[in-house]
């Protein structure tokens, strides 16, 4: 069993430590996997497309620009991620349906909750490098998240 604290101790020079605080909404407090990315502004169509197409064990990282205008993830999209056996979702933005999300058996991190839904225009970008939390989120890098924080590495760190 790995912990981000132990990985930081062992691989300090080989990883990035996210400086942004997230709240945990999913059932899993600890999760890891290869990163896939989506960048959107108040529109979650590409989030849904990513969840429907990513391979098992992936962590979808969504950069919503920390917008407080709407939620980018709710119970319906989280159920898709759980059904497809994704490891987790990290949202630089907000979620809704939080009472249902706590029963979804994946990791879900976000800044907080917002009750209103996003627009559905399909605008945004997928599979690009993202910058938030003081780190670079690159597709196919590895992310590790638990109760102590979020770290990123170019290679798999746990055994």
From Swiss-Prot:
Species this protein is from: Bacillus cereus (strain ATCC 10987 / NRS 248)
UniProt remark on cofactor binding? Divalent metal cation.
Instruction: Supply the InterPro entries for this chain.
Output: RraA (IPR010203), RraA/RraA-like (IPR005493), RraA/RraA-like_sf (IPR036704)
Concerning Pfam families, the annotation shows: RraA-like
Catalysis performed (reactions): 4-hydroxy-4-methyl-2-oxoglutarate = 2 pyruvate; oxaloacetate + H(+) = pyruvate + CO2
Coiled-coil annotated residue ranges, if any: none
* MF terms in GO: 4-hydroxy-4-methyl-2-oxoglutarate aldolase activity; metal ion binding; oxaloacetate decarboxylase activity; ribonuclease inhibitor activity
Give the function comment from the record: Catalyzes the aldol cleavage of 4-hydroxy-4-methyl-2-oxoglutarate (HMG) into 2 molecules of pyruvate. Also contains a secondary oxaloacetate (OAA) decarboxylase activity due to the common pyruvate enolate transition state formed following C-C bond cleavage in the retro-aldol and decarboxylation reactions.
Q: Which PANTHER family match?
A: 4-HYDROXY-4-METHYL-2-OXOGLUTARATE ALDOLASE 3-RELATED
State the family named in the UniProt similarity comment for this chain: Belongs to the class II aldolase/RraA-like family.
Gene3D superfamilies in the cross-refs? Ribonuclease E inhibitor RraA/RraA-like
Name the Gene Ontology biological process terms.
regulation of RNA metabolic process
Primary enzyme class:
lyase
The residues that hold substrate are 74-77, 96
Q: Which cofactor names does the annotation list?
A: a divalent metal cation
Q: Does the keyword Lyase apply?
A: yes
Q: What is its EC number?
A: 4.1.3.17, 4.1.1.112
Task: Write down what this protein is called.
Answer: Putative 4-hydroxy-4-methyl-2-oxoglutarate aldolase
Summarize the subunit comment. Answer: Homotrimer.
Q: Which positions does UniProt annotate for a divalent metal cation binding?
A: 97
Query: What are the entry keywords?
Result: Lyase, Metal-binding
């Amino acid at each position: 069993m790995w912990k981000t604290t132990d990985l930081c101790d062992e691989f300090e020079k080989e990883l990035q430590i996210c400086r942004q605080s997230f709240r945990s909404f999913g059932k899993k407090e600890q999760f890891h996997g290869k990163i896939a990315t989506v960048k959107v502004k108040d529109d979650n169509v590409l989030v849904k497309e990513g969840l429907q197409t990513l391979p098992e064990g992936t962590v979808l990282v969504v950069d919503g620009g920390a917008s407080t205008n709407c939620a980018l993830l709710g119970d319906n999209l989280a159920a898709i991620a759980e059904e497809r056996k994704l490891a987790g979702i990290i949202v630089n933005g907000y979620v809704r349906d939080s009472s249902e999300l706590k029963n979804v058996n994946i990791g879900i991190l976000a800044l907080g909750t917002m009750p209103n839904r996003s627009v559905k225009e399909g605008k945004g970008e997928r599979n690009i490098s993202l910058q938030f939390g003081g780190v670079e989120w690159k597709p196919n890098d590895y992310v590790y998240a638990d109760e102590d924080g979020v770290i990123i590495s170019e290679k798999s760190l746990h055994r």
